[in-house]
Amino acid sequence: MRSVVIGGGAIGTLIARQLSRFEGEVILIEKREDLGQGITKANSAIIHGGYDDPPASLRGKLCARGNELYDGLARELKVPVKRIGSIVVARNEEEFKKLEELLVNGQANGVRDLRILGREELHVLEPAISSEFNYALYCGSAGITEPWMVAIAASI
């Protein structure tokens, strides 16, 4: 079997890597001079927690699971991952309701280390944050990586 993957960014190289584990030829086509030079280079580098997507959606089902798998992938590829966490802030009760919705989504999606912080805990976690913020959804499993390094490492 012959497989052709178009795009040598993080996603394309990871797909090609996975396909190469099976019998057959894998061809990776990239239009730029090097891997990871397109969208991957401009990527925010965030490893999303998985709380934003509705549980019934495909992305909702896969985002939290992908987050869990990322540490193993990073070890395999020898690329950095920092679990720095993320926060979504709210000023008032109306915005707080949105945090509660995100919490319910995240729990249904299986997101680890997800909770709502009150004002005091939020300002201890982020001392420089504006005093107008009273609540936050904290996701400790969110992290960052180096997407272009993922693309290069996955291609080796």
Regions found by a protein language model. Give the residues of each.
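Aromatic/hydrophobic pocket-lining residues that form π-stacking "cages" and hydrophobic walls in ligand
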Residues: 15, 70, 102, 153-154
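N-terminal Rossmann-like FAD-binding beta1-loop-alpha1 element of flavoenzymes
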Residues: 1-28
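Dinucleotide-binding Rossmann-like beta1-alpha1 core, especially the glycine-rich loop
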Residues: 45-125, 134
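Glycine-rich FAD pyrophosphate-binding loop
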Residues: 20-42
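Short, glycine/charged-enriched secondary-structure capping and boundary segments
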Residues: 19-21, 41-44, 61, 102-104, ...
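Short beta-to-alpha linker loops that shape the active-site pocket of alpha/beta-hydrolase fold enzymes
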Residues: 32-34, 122, 154
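Active-site phosphate/pyrophosphate- and oxyanion-stabilizing loops and adjacent acidic/basic residues
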Residues: 17, 120, 152, 156
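Helical element adjacent to the flavin cofactor pocket in flavoenzyme catalytic cores
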Residues: 136-156
